[in-house]
From Swiss-Prot:
GO molecular function, one term: transcription cis-regulatory region binding
Domain of life: Eukaryota
Region feature (Disordered): 97-120
Record-given protein name: Dof zinc finger protein DOF2.1
PANTHER family: DOF ZINC FINGER PROTEIN DOF1.4-RELATED, DOF ZINC FINGER PROTEIN DOF2.1
Organism, scientific name: Arabidopsis thaliana (Mouse-ear cress)
Pfam families given in the database record: Zn_ribbon_Dof
Biased composition (Low complexity): 103-118
UniProtKB keywords: DNA-binding, Metal-binding, Nucleus, Transcription, Transcription regulation, Zinc, Zinc-finger
Gene Ontology process terms (BP): regulation of DNA-templated transcription
Length: 288
């Protein structure tokens, strides 16, 4: 083979290889440009008029399902989408439901505010307590908690001695006899002179037996804490031996107290235990 033919064959091969490489590069460039145009929406064609309002103020958005045959447009005047070759739907952008949700949320907040206001302003309504003044338990922002107890005690001092001490103003005995003028938790037949105090207090009944009642910190007499006093020497006459036993502790009634306030005997130096004998008698300790 001639050397000239060999050179010509080599040149042809190089030309073909270079041409194929160049064509491949051109194809890649074309594909990249097409992708860019598709992403920009330039292949959607010219700006089309809106099929609803016939406004030219439209723009290309995207292709449905990545199909070039279904370009989707948006009309800026009527603010609606449409797809070329598809059906028209009267659905605005965002829809009117979003505004409705905002209005409903604002109305809901207003209702909550009204409920909270009514909760603080409305007086306490209880079908069991009808004669109670609203200022006794009604919450007021301008009154402190300490002042609330002061007003409650002031209302008690202005009431009668035989009326219940919660300011109910009448015969209100839920657990006791309806004829007795006792507080809420009055339990036995007889008329007791109840009063509002903090600590221990006694009531005088028709059975002539002194009783000690436990009053809670809110001035409410507790039925479970009411226990009868019993003499240590098992004598029914209270004048012979005024020493009493209450919850296992010896108490002594002074002569000036007249059966109203129990006091601890200052002369007792030792308790001699909780269950020791006292004057040859057993201590009857009631369980609370």
């Amino acid at each position: 083979m001639d050397p000239e033919q060999e050179i010509s064959n080599e040149t042809l091969e190089t030309i073909l290889v270079s041409s194929t490489k160049g064509s491949n590069n051109n194809n890649k460039k074309m594909e990249e440009e097409m992708k860019k145009k598709v992403s920009r929406g330039e292949l959607g064609g010219e700006a089309q008029n809106c099929p609803r309002c016939e406004s030219p103020n439209t723009k290309f958005c995207y292709y449905n399902n990545y199909s070039l045959s279904q370009p989707r447009y948006f009309c800026k005047s009527c603010r609606r989408y449409w797809t070329k070759g598809g059906t028209l739907r009267n659905v605005p952008v965002g829809g009117g439901c979003r505004r409705n949700k905002r209005s409903s949320s604002s109305a809901f907040s207003k209702n909550n505010n009204n409920k909270s206001i009514n909760f603080h302003t409305d007086p306490l309504q209880n079908p069991l307590i009808t004669g109670m003044p609203p200022s006794s338990f009604g919450y007021d922002h301008s009154i402190d908690l300490n002042l609330a107890f002061a007003t409650l005690q002031k209302h008690h001092l202005s009431s009668q001695a035989t009326t219940p001490s919660f300011g109910f103003g009448g015969d209100l005995s839920i657990y006791g006899n309806s004829t007795n003028d006792v507080g809420i938790f009055g339990g036995q037949n007889g008329t007791y002179n109840n009063s509002l105090c903090y600590g221990f207090m006694s009531g005088n009944g028709n059975n002539n037996q002194n009783e000690i009642k436990m009053a809670s910190t809110l001035g409410m007499s507790l039925e479970g804490n009411e226990r009868k006093q019993e003499n240590v020497n098992n004598n029914n006459n209270n004048s012979e031996n005024p020493s009493k036993v209450f919850w296992g502790f010896p108490w002594q009634m002074t002569g000036d107290s007249a059966g109203v306030v129990p006091e601890i005997d200052p002369g007792r130096e030792s308790w001699n235990g909780m269950v020791s004998s006292w004057n040859n008698g057993l201590l009857n300790t009631p369980l609370v």
